[in-house]
């Protein structure tokens, strides 16, 4: 069996390379004698990437995943929206690691080199660092982290010096590689957060752990206790310039660590990992562990020094909102060829795939030999050359070239029934092929090649471009190998109607998309805005085997009811395609009533061809419905193209005339422009500091509510207050009531002590002039 032949770990594909890695690893560790922490010299800079598996068929892809990927951890983290929730970055996959208590070291080794820490190189380096080097800084950070933890805060627990020393000694013993019998029946003791922090300093490389916040029950899913493992561990014992800034990404679930690696050349997404969690309608930053109080105040600066931080625009929880989140850039595969195990494993997978295909083919032939009445599929006779029939999407066969199976059968039938067609011109006498129907029948298996039946069981040898019919009876569209022989529409019908729609899928074509508009992708949205006549006449040629250029989910509703429509005077085999008609038959009919249509009409379709008759009926029904309702049904009309440059999608008023993608780009551009403007304002404020201090040293007006500068040192009031007091005095002299002085408003500019006025839009004169000059 291929499942048994496929290695269950990367290092099993080439033991020589695995031995070479295990020999180099301990030699690369530098052990200073002056108390400095043990650390790697060069090998900590390597990174592993998994090969792509989409080129294999789904059945064999399942075998690869069973061999290498820890699907339970991956499914758990993805269901909790901790892993692969951001569509802007590449997907991460969890590789299997041994669960012997040393899984943290196994995961870190696999992320860098593709082998596990079976020789305990990292474990021994961790233990030696805690025993033989100066650990006062580690102990101090651990004590600070413990005092901030929930156990100390909520219980009021207090430790004396002896308690702290005992706890620290216990942590050092847990890191030992010589433990004869660990707790919980494991070979080694499990490690904790402080061990991850020490490991990041040994590797001189940040470690990011993706984990749930709560320890949950495996049966009920209820919360047991808070988890503190997840977060960011920076190698703070080293200057940032001496560290490798691409992090190691690990997953943690059910007390088990796994490496989370990217897929090589998987797509245009960014090779990065978000530094936030998306939880309860907001974005929450990942915790940075073991920071002192001064370091906690400069956390953002530390992240940018030890990581390559980039800002990514993502869609918010509210519709139409965009957020900028921080993400750490990940390294690409850089293992040298002499120690690259992924390439060897990929070559082995390709070899096993060929053997698996041959075995599957032999098993299928043996099953057919045991049951000769069972129809066989002539898929292995297909050639990679299209059929010569115009508009036919199928491929020719070795036995029927230059035609496909169905076109060859149709030609034979037309030639054998040509005299009958000349004598009987009516469409009732033509036993043609119905739209989307198949000529295959079990009685015809004895002679000649046949087309593939709609229930073909073996589809894994073909790519998605191989044109074959959907296995649903009467469906004219092409199957998808990932939908078990059904097309997208028929596969969607089989899904439970109560199943909630996935926001990442188009509701029309059911394809994974990065952005949708009202639940549908841009392609389907443009199709809904087009007129029915243009979409039908341009996308469906007259051949009964023509695969529609439009999406099947848009046309199946209108084509299926009419593909084999029977009337009282039409026989069951009277479903006729235009391609099945002969020149002799067309001589007795007239052109379609629709102007510019190249096909022929029939009396039962009121002079229209089949497609134009479908359009006629739909238009008639829509007109009748609009007359009854009094107003036309709401449609996507009067839409304008997106305002973005060289963008062919439709814009939306919700996105200021842009499509969703261009709106995010525009928002990002505005964000950078606003940041540049803010920096210009700061620089201008620094330039005006001497002048501001000089103005502040001048004498101010004696009135408490006035901040104006005196024009003359001999006076106590400014000119404005003098005029105001004179005006108030004259009014009081005339016996008129004194108007209350209106409260003055501060200048709108930040950090300005002057008062604004209405003429300057709320700014003071100086700030208004500055704003006019510099914008």
Swiss-Prot record:
It is found in: Cytoplasm; Nucleus; Lysosome. Zn(2+) 5 binds at residues 642, 647, 659, 662. Its EC number is 2.3.2.-, 3.4.19.12. Residues 590-640 are annotated as: Required for proteasomal degradation of UBE2N and UBE2D3, TRAF6 deubiquitination, and TAX1BP1 interaction with UBE2N. Residues 386-445 are annotated as: Interaction with RIPK1. Residues 92-263 form the OTU domain. Residues 369-775 are annotated as: Interaction with TNIP1. Residues 591-775 are annotated as: Sufficient for inhibitory activity of TNF-induced NF-kappa-B activity. Residues 415-455, 567-590 are annotated as: Disordered. Belongs to the peptidase C64 family. This is Tumor necrosis factor alpha-induced protein 3. The gene is Tnfaip3.
């Amino acid at each position: 069996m291929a499942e048994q032949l496929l290695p269950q770990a990367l290092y099993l594909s080439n033991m020589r390379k695995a031995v070479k890695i295990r020999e180099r690893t301990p030699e690369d560790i530098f052990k200073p004698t002056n108390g400095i922490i043990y650390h790697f010299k060069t090998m900590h800079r390597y990174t592993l990437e998994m090969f792509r598996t989409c080129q294999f068929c789904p059945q064999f892809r399942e075998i690869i995943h069973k061999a290498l990927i820890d699907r339970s951890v991956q499914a758990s983290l993805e269901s909790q929206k901790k892993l692969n929730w951001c569509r802007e970055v590449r997907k991460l996959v969890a590789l299997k690691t041994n669960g012997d208590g040393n899984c943290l070291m196994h995961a870190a080794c696999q992320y860098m080199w593709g082998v596990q820490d079976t020789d305990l190189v990292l474990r021994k380096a961790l233990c030696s660092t805690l025993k033989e080097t100066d650990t006062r800084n580690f102990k101090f950070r651990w004590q600070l982290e413990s005092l901030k933890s929930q156990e100390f805060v909520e219980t009021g627990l207090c430790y004396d010096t002896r308690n702290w020393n005992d706890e620290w000694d216990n942590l050092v013993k847990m890191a030992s590689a010589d433990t004869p019998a660990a707790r919980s029946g494991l070979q080694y003791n499990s490690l904790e957060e402080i061990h991850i922090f020490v490991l990041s300093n040994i590797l001189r490389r940040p470690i990011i752990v993706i984990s749930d916040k709560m320890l949950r029950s495996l049966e009920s899913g209820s919360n047991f206790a808070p988890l503190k493992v997840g977060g960011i561990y920076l190698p703070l014992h080293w200057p940032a310039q001496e560290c490798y800034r691409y992090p190691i990404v690990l997953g943690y679930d059910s007390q088990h660590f796994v490496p989370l690696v990217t897929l090589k050349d998987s797509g245009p997404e960014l090779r990065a990992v978000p530094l936030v969690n998306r939880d309860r309608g907001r974005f929450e930053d990942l915790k940075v562990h073991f920071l002192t109080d001064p370091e906690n105040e400069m956390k953002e600066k530390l992240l940018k020094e030890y990581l390559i931080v980039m800002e990514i625009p993502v869609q918010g929880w509210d519709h139409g909102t965009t957020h900028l989140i921080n993400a750490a850039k990940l390294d690409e595969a850089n293992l040298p060829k002499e120690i690259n195990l992924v390439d060897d494993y990929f070559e082995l997978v390709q070899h096993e795939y060929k053997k698996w295909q041959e075995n599957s083919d032999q098993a299928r032939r043996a099953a057919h030999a045991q049951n000769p009445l069972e129809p066989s599929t002539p898929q292995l006779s297909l050639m990679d050359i299209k059929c010569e029939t115009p508009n036919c999407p199928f491929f020719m066969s070795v036995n029927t070239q230059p035609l496909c199976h169905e076109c060859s059968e149709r030609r034979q039938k037309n030639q054998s029934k040509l005299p009958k067609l000349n004598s009987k011109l009516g469409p009732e006498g033509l036993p043609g092929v119905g739209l989307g129907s198949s000529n295959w029948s079990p009685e015809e298996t004895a002679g000649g090649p046949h087309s593939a039946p709609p229930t073909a069981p073996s589809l894994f040898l073909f790519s998605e471009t191989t044109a074959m019919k959907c296995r649903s009876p009467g469906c004219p569209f092409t199957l998808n190998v990932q939908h078990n022989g059904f097309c997208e529409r028929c596969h969607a019908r089989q899904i439970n109607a109560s199943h909630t729609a996935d926001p990442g899928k188009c509701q029309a074509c059911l394809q994974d998309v990065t952005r949708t508009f009202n639940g549908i992708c841009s392609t389907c949205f443009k199709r809904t805005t087009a007129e029915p006549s243009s979409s039908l006449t341009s996308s469906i040629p007259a051949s009964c085997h023509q695969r529609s250029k439009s999406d099947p989910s848009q046309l199946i509703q209108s084509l299926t009811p009419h593909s084999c429509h029977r009337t009282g005077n039409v026989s069951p085999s009277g479903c006729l395609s235009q391609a099945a008609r002969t020149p002799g038959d067309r001589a007795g009919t007239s052109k379609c009533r629709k102007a510019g249509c190249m096909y022929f009409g029939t009396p039962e379709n009121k002079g229209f061809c089949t497609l134009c008759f479908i359009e006629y009926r739909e238009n008639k029904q829509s007109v009748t419905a609009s007359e009854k309702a009094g107003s036309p049904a709401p449609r996507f009309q009067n839409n304008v193209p997106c305002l973005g440059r060289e963008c062919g999608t439709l814009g939306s008023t919700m996105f200021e005339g842009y499509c969703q993608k261009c709106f995010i780009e525009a928002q990002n551009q505005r964000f950078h422009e606003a940041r540049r403007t803010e920096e210009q304002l700061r620089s201008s404020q620094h330039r005006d500091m001497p002048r501001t201090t000089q103005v502040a040293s001048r004498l101010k007006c004696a009135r408490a509510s006035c901040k104006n500068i005196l024009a003359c040192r001999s006076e106590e009031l400014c000119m404005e207050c003098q005029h105001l007091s004179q005006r108030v005095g004259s009014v009081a002299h005339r016996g008129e009531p004194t108007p209350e002085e209106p409260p003055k408003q501060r200048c709108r500019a930040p950090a300005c002590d002057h008062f604004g006025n209405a003429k300057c839009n709320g700014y003071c004169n100086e700030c208004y002039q500055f704003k006019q000059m510099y914008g």
